[in-house]
Amino acid sequence: MEDDAGNCGGLTAFALRLAKRLADDGDNSNRNVVFSPVSLYAALALVASGARGTTLDELVALLGAASLDDLEESVRRAVEVGLADESESGGPRVSYACGVWHDERLALKPAYRAADFQRQPKSSRKKINKWVSKATNKLIREILPDGSVHGGTALVLVNAIYFKGKWSNPFPRERTTTGKFHRLDGSSVDAPFMSSREDQYIGFYDGFKVLKLPYHRTMKNHGDGGDITPAILKHYGENVGLSMYIFLPDARDGLPALVDKMAVASSGTASSSFLRDHRPGRRRIKVGDLRVPRFKVSFYSEMNEVLKGMGIGAAFDVGKVDLSGMIDGELVVVEKVMHRAVVEVNEEGTEAAAATACTMKFLCLTLTSPVDFVADHPFAFFVVEEKSDAVLFAGHVLDPTSLE
């Protein structure tokens, strides 16, 4: 498992830096935030696969990779290991789907799903949203809002993730009670709190505590296929299966400082190990008062400005973008990166889904819609050699019927 964690170090660092950016965004200052780092990471990596020059360099740097090959390997490991479905072995259900839709007149490298963005943008948008809804078990019914697909759309990259897992030790529903949840502004709100008398994995650190809530699973091809036992954990190590980690600052208003601390760590050499280094030990400990709120959080954001602030301006800049490795003979620019996520945590476990969509538009009008060019009034002309830009002839025409 250590190798897997190392290969996903760029993803971990990206997750912590993005958490900081989203927390600092003024629009999010008073609302819950949930996002899927792996969904966004995979979407941006797909854009990087068709990028060249500065556009590629910025994407690779943001995603914490040494090269495009290194980035592609990181994504492969994240999908194969981090998003591996464990439902057949009694563990969480995890599904991941990736789709690419391109304007039907394009020659994409390689070819993916074709769509008639020019003549049927609304139906194309609905078709993609329907695909996302199915991939997320209807938790996310729309990733592309009205107007996000239009006649000038060249390409839409989409991925979707669905997760459903039961706790290894569920919270008894009869122990759920209403209590005060203290918000950052000092006010409080009544919320349902889950509780348990079971021993728990809890780690104590400078200024914060960490609770680990493992999801139920069984070990494939091990003995009689029963539950993971302490002996199995000792043999395989602590990092077995999927778990939720709750980072709780000691101070009621300490979350911003904790997020800052994570972001600072993500920019250094220890970026890939911060979360790993702050996991509780492998022994459960007795707890007195254990209360975790039951919640459901949904979040939608157009990520352009956040991503620009993290260093990938060229992909959105018509004067700098280079995505020539993706589409033959056409200039395109990233128009929008949209992300939606939902997470529900209750006594039984967790159900969550996320989707990321990246739309690209043409830089010129050659394919967006038919245009008129009627030279029925005076015009200028130039005869230019393309490679050297040498102008061989130049002039203007005031009357095409006159020799002079």
Swiss-Prot record:
Protein name per UniProt: Serpin-Z2B
Query: What one GO molecular function would you report for this record?
Result: serine-type endopeptidase inhibitor activity
Domain writeup: The reactive center loop (RCL) extends out from the body of the protein and directs binding to the target protease. The protease cleaves the serpin at the reactive site within the RCL, establishing a covalent linkage between the carboxyl group of the serpin reactive site and the serine hydroxyl of the protease. The resulting inactive serpin-protease complex is highly stable.
The record describes the protein's role as:
Probable serine protease inhibitor.
Taxonomy, top ranks, is: Eukaryota, Viridiplantae, Streptophyta, Embryophyta, Tracheophyta
Provide GO CC annotations from the record. extracellular space
Site annotation (Reactive bond) points to: L363, C364
Q: Which Gene3D superfamilies match?
A: Alpha-1-antitrypsin, domain 1 (2.30.39.10), Antithrombin, subunit I, domain 2 (3.30.497.10)
